[in-house]
């Protein structure tokens, strides 16, 4: 696959505390050859599932909630650095925060500081996904010009119940890349989407 429109772009990925965050390395490795540089910003709950140190092997830099050497990260600098900001996986919590302008962590504050729209890749179980409040938050994000790529139906192991069952999951890295490219092209065609 050759997506030359992205080759000189800087991609920022926000990682939230969904269990699917443990598979983020496959997305980072896949995206690596299509972007100039990839950086990651993580919530504390994401770091509880996969340490920032581990994620750093698959990208150019990781920003974590606690900062570096006692110094907090600037969400403004992080947001301005990125040409494209995606949140993979996006939890119901981050959808709710950002839809309502609430910024309780570095991932959410960076959405507010990023000069363009953000692309959200939600991942949660069916019970959460089908809640009216989640639908309302997604609708608000879209009204605000953000892009929400819906999860797909898959057979998945549900940790909460310890069973395999039909559920929701992230789209594959190759399809995620196509969604990012499409979102970027739309933004360049319609600057009002920023």
Swiss-Prot record:
GO terms for molecular function: FMN binding; oxidoreductase activity; phosphopantothenoylcysteine decarboxylase activity. It is an enzyme of class 4 (lyase). Its cofactor is FAD. This is Mersacidin decarboxylase. The active site is at residue 75. Catalyzes the oxidative decarboxylation of the C-terminal cysteine residue of mersacidin to an aminoenethiol residue. It comes from Bacillus sp. (strain HIL-Y85/54728). Its EC number is 4.1.1.-. GO terms for biological process: antibiotic biosynthetic process; coenzyme A biosynthetic process. Pathway: Antibiotic biosynthesis; mersacidin biosynthesis. PANTHER family: HOMO-OLIGOMERIC FLAVIN CONTAINING CYS DECARBOXYLASE FAMILY (PTHR14359), PHOSPHOPANTOTHENOYLCYSTEINE DECARBOXYLASE (PTHR14359:SF6). One of its GO terms (cellular component) is phosphopantothenoylcysteine decarboxylase complex.
């Amino acid at each position: 696959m050759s997506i030359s429109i992205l080759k000189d772009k800087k991609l920022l990925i926000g990682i939230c505390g969904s269990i699917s965050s443990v598979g983020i390395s496959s997305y980072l490795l896949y995206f690596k050859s299509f972007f100039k540089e990839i950086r990651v910003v993580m919530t504390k709950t994401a770091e509880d599932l996969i340490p920032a140190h581990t994620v750093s092997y698959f990208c150019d830099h990781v920003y974590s909630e606690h900062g570096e050497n006692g110094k907090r990260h600037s969400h403004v600098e992080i947001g301005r650095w990125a040409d494209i900001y995606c949140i993979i996986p996006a939890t119901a919590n981050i959808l709710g925060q950002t839809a309502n302008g609430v910024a309780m962590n570095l991932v959410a504050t960076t959405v507010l500081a990023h000069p363009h729209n953000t692309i959200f890749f939600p991942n949660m179980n069916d019970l959460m996904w089908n809640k009216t409040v989640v639908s309302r938050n997604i609708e608000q994000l879209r009204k605000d010009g953000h892009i929400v790529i819906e999860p797909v139906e898959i057979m998945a192991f549900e940790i909460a119940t310890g069973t395999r069952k039909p559920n929701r999951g992230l789209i594959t890295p190759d399809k995620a890349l196509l969604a990012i490219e499409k979102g970027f092209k739309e933004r360049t065609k319609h600057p009002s989407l920023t």
